[in-house]
């Protein structure tokens, strides 16, 4: 027997499908434009990912919608340019999780949006890169829950745990060290291809 449920609370599968004109980016932008606050935890952020979301994030800055973004130095993939641009937005707190142990990576991909006590959470494979948000084959699930829902509570608690972890460094505290590591790694890769 089928059980009727409120469609607004039904989970959604979200992917990119250029044939149908569907992008993960559209779902994320829509949630950003309707939320009271947001928290994002992604392993990788690059210039193209910031550019994809820039206008929406600037609109949220104008409206005073606060957000937190947690990324990482894992694999030195996140581009300092993109981090600089995110940190320049006055409504966003940015932290970088410092992976000290090479065997203990940081590979999260979660977008949490809160509006009037309701969470809409997108979790899956999409980093904050243009290809992940618009063209790659990515699989994500959007969950909708009240603040009291067990799944939402678990996800929010895990975000808070990572956000408060001593390895999560503020942008101001860690960006110069990260920039040096990133440039060193980029130079090593460049020399390897010569």
Identify the meaning behind each predicted range:
Residues 1-191:
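PLD/PLD-like phosphodiesterase catalytic module centered on the HKD motif
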């Amino acid at each position: 027997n089928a059980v009727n449920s409120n469609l607004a609370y039904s989970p959604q599968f979200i992917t990119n499908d250029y044939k149908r004109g569907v992008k993960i980016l559209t779902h994320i932008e829509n949630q950003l434009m309707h939320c009271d606050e947001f928290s994002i935890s992604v392993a990788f952020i690059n210039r193209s990912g910031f550019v994809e979301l820039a206008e929406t994030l600037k609109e949220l800055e104008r409206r005073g919608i606060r957000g937190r973004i947690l990324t990482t130095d894992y694999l030195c993939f996140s581009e300092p340019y993109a981090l600089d641009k995110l940190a320049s937005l006055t409504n966003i707190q940015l932290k970088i999780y410092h992976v000290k142990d090479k065997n203990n990576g940081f590979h999260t991909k979660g977008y949490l949006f809160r509006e009037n006590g309701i969470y809409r959470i997108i979790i899956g494979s999409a980093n904050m890169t243009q290809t992940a948000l618009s063209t790659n084959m990515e699989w994500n699930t959007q969950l909708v829950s009240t603040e009291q829902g067990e799944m939402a509570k678990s996800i929010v608690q895990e975000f808070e745990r990572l956000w408060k972890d001593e390895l999560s460094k503020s942008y101001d505290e860690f960006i110069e060290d990260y920039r040096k590591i990133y440039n060193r790694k980029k130079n090593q890769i460049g020399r390897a291809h010569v």
